[in-house]
Structure formats: C-alpha cells, structure tokens
C-alpha cells in the first residue's frame, strides 16, 4: 500500500519547499518487535535490566530495517512511469507530471517516506523494568527515551541518504498478533507481556 494512515509526514527532507503531505506516499515500512527486545534484555528473564544491550540491539535492528527499506526503494526507483499509469498519470505524486513514460521513478519517489514502525512499547517496558508507561513515571520516561532513540536514528538516516525516513507506531493488529504468537512459543507466557492476544500498538 502506498499510504499508511498513521504516517505522520514530518517535513520533506529532500526539498524544503515541498514539505507538503499530499503527493507523497509511504513507500514502504517495516516494523520492529519491541517486546522481543524487552524480553531478551529485561528483568523478566535476567537478574537486572540491560539497557546498553537493549539499545545496541535496537540500533542494529534499525540498521537492518533501514537497509531493507533502501533496497526496496531502489527496486521501486528502477520501475518506470508506465508501470504505474494510474498513480502517476493523475499527478498524484509531486513532480510526476514532469516525467516521461520511460523515465525511472527515482525523481518522484524520493519525495515519499520510508517508515520504520514499532510495535508493543507497553509490553516492551513491562519486560524491561516490570512496569509499563501507564503504571509508573519511570516507565513513562523510559518509553519516551526509547522513542526518542528511534526517532533520532531515523533523522540520522534521513540526513545521510537525503530521503524521508520516519518513525511510526504500527497500526497492525494482525502483525502484532503474529509477533506475540512467536514470542509466546519461544519465551512462554509472561505476565503483562505475552499473555494476551496481540501487542498494543499505541504509545
């Protein structure tokens, strides 16, 4: 899908004059399963919470997702205008009216967003420190720190590649159900973490 309903398009890195939401879609996004990282580095399975290990692995995962998004972006860019007559013929995308049918799509797709999604912040916090952001001030603070860490990394990618990398809370009940079933199989039932139908996807 080209549009993610929750994509908050935050300023167009590529071209300041074109910082408008219409005309840019969400090119693709991949979600990070935060509860799994929380379980691996948190108090639920260890003597103490290892935030250093948590952030290291989160950073590595984000780099993997970034590479995957870039790879997909390159594939999309190598398509030509005639592959998408409706989307582009209607002038839906910024600059699409300037392309000829045989032009590659990079010129216009660079205005789109590459989104790194995250799921299950509440369960992640519960696994890390035993409480989620609705239950304690400390958890609330940590939750914001985790989001800020991810947001800053997205901003770094955006600067480095001159593309619109954004962070979004994944609206994916189906996906979060799949994640939780895998984690339940691997780590068993953990109260407040894997003992539910699906991971929450809100802040």
Task: Report the location of each language-model feature.
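Conserved catalytic cores of very large enzyme subunits
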Residues: 1-110, 131-132, 136-203
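Contiguous, well-ordered alpha-helical segments that form the cores/surfaces of helical PPI scaffolds
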Residues: 114-127, 148
């Amino acid at each position: 899908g080209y549009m993610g309903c929750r994509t908050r398009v935050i300023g167009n890195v590529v071209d300041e004059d074109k910082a408008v939401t219409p005309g840019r879609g969400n090119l693709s996004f991949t979600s990070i399963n935060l509860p799994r990282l929380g379980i691996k580095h948190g108090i639920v399975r260890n003597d103490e919470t290892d935030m250093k290990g948590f952030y290291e692995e989160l950073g590595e995962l984000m780099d993997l997702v970034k590479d995957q998004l870039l790879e997909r972006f390159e594939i999309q860019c190598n398509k030509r205008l005639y592959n998408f007559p409706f989307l582009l013929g209607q002038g839906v995308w910024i600059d699409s009216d300037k392309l000829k049918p045989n032009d590659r799509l990079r010129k216009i797709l660079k205005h789109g967003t590459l989104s790194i999604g995250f799921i299950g912040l509440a369960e992640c916090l519960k696994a890390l420190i035993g409480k989620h952001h609705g239950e304690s001030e400390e958890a609330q603070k940590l939750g914001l720190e985790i989001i800020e860490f991810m947001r800053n990394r997205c901003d770094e990618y955006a600067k480095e590649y001159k593309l619109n990398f954004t962070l979004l809370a994944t609206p994916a009940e189906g996906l979060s159900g799949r994640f939780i079933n895998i984690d339940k199989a691997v780590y068993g039932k953990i109260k407040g973490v894997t003992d539910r139908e699906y991971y929450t996807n809100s802040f």
